[in-house]
Amino acid sequence: MYTIKTILKEILGHLPKVDFKEVYAEDLYKRLETEKDADVKKLLQDKLYTIQITDEIKSVLVAEKVKEVAGKLGYGLMINQSKTAYLYNTVSWEMITELDLKHFLSNVFQRMGADKYTAKNVRIANKIYEQACYSLYNPAENDKDIKINLNNKTLLINDDGTVSEREHSADDYFFYALPYDYDPKAECPLFYKFLNEVLPQKDVQQVLKEFIGCCLNPSIKLEKVLCCVGTGANGKSVFFETMLRVLGEDNVSSYNINSLCDDKGYSRIMIKNKLLNYSSDFNGKIWGNGIFKQLASGEPVEARRLYQEPEMVRDYARLAFNCNSIPTSSDNSYGFRRRLLIIPFDMKIDPDKADPDLAKKLRAELPGILLWAIEGLKQFMLNGKKLSPSSTIEAMDQEYKEDTDSVVMFLKAKNYIPDSTGKKKLLDLHREYKEFCIGNSLKPENKTDFRIKLQGERYKVEKEGTNKAYMVGVSNSIPSVTSPFVSPT
């Protein structure tokens, strides 16, 4: 796979010098050669004489010729709706900066016959570029197939979990390639040994495998942010470095979660066409704003390059981060919590037994680790595009709720449980909840959000009676006990 510079040089070398007028009026020239009638021939000559080849016409001819020659050589050029240019290098599409493309098109113009000073004129260079934005326009819409791109093959993951191998195609619109070859017989015994040491719970390993598998295809809807939690010397850093190389360093970014969620959007544009944004050391508070939820859900999000207009980005990295403890947030809603995929790295590695070169040794097993990730992707699809259940992770989620959600804290403190036979007015329960929050310096939810959260915790809330008041199906899990020291009255 050649570099962009090498490919552009090759395309340039195959462009012929042309007479722009002959190319533009090709049909008239052909007719003139075959015409026998002198009067008609004279009319054709007069017509050709009056044709003026403007800069606009030359711009069209340059853009169309570049597209034609690139295609014949097995390459491709396209510009999308955001005016971002890409070059197909026979394996994947790589971005070309606007300035590099302008210089290339200027060289093409000169190669095709323009004099040096005309070709280098800024006005004309800009005109050719604007024409290229039209002639090379391609929205590059991906199909719905689940595919993975490597150096030597493209893999198609079928609905039944089987894997098919295909040759590379520009029409797949891959903007990445894993930096190694596919080997269906590869193994990774050292990686499995590492996983069993740092994540002995098999249910957790399975979910982690499925998440990494989903990172291999950005079009999969997952709506999860990986949160690897644990204090030092527990394998998080080795896992981070290994995933960095499995997915390819060029395909992974490491921007701080909160910088991705700010209003400016400069960091967000940098995760466009990446497979994963893995922040290796995040310890703090996640901004509770809508941008985090958008990013976690893979929804279109506004981003911008410095000094440029904002654009809507659709294909961007999944999010992951390592942290010593579960992060806090001003948003304690279910919608926020459900997007966090908490993986507990709670096994301490004995410093005397730790291998400082383990991450380097695991590089030799990348094709095998890829097969591990593909197995996770296949299981995710067989699950109906859902992560496998994990009692360990569910327990972590419940603990997180009890530590961050005032409604869940209240229910736990009062030993309340859902019970369709027990009834309590929502108004009374909410008043009791507010008193609990005041006593514990917590910000209470309003009555509507309180009701919604109760329903989220599987409490039945319905309007009953003649006044249609909301009633909650709730009871106390610890029955009251009469003290043996008090005589009944």
Residue ranges and their predicted role:
Residues 1-82, 110-489:
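Feature primarily recognizes SF3-like P-loop helicase cores of small DNA viruses
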Residues 83-88, 92-106:
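Trp- and S/T/G-rich repeat-edge/linker motifs of beta-rich repeat architectures
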